[in-house]
Amino acid sequence: EIADYFRILQGGEIKEHVIPWIEKNNPEISTEINNRIKMASNITKDEINLANKFRNDLISEVNISLPKGNIAIFPTTPFSAPLCGQDEYALGASRKKLMSMTSITGMTSRPQISIPKLKDKTGPVGISLLGWENSDEILLNKLTEI
């Protein structure tokens, strides 16, 4: 759910700020990016309004659950690093799962640091630290303690 709302808000920004530049300059764009541009061009104001409501509710919830001075630690992804040469379809499915874990920082304007701290049988597994608003420097300093 969070990844879907993030996609809508990001797509809305692309529609407002990037698509006019693309239409004016006609740059060469990869098929994958072009597909995302087309998706963004179809986002409606109602979808953006609903996504903004979700975002505001999420910010309120995170402010209560993770007040100033606290740091959340959680897995960066629900799986280890993708394998080299993995096909686009598999990567696309993995990307949505990944976005459900990493889009909280973009949705709440909080700093997040991800580090490859752990390892499982298939490769490195990242952990993320999520801080409170404007705690970027403090979060970076916490890395020395890990």
Question: What is each PLM-predicted segment?
Answer:
Residues A3-F54, P116-P124:
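Short helix-loop capping/hinge segments that flank enzyme active sites or metal/cofactor-binding pockets
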Residues N52-S60, R95:
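Short gly/ser/thr-rich secondary-structure transition/capping motifs
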Residues G69:
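An anion/phosphate-binding loop that grips the pyrophosphate of nucleotide cofactors and donors
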Residues A81-M99:
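Short, surface-exposed loop/helix-turn segments at secondary-structure junctions
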Residues A93-I115:
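Small-aliphatic-rich amphipathic alpha-helix that forms the alpha element of a beta-alpha
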Residues M107-I146:
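Structural helix-boundary/capping segments
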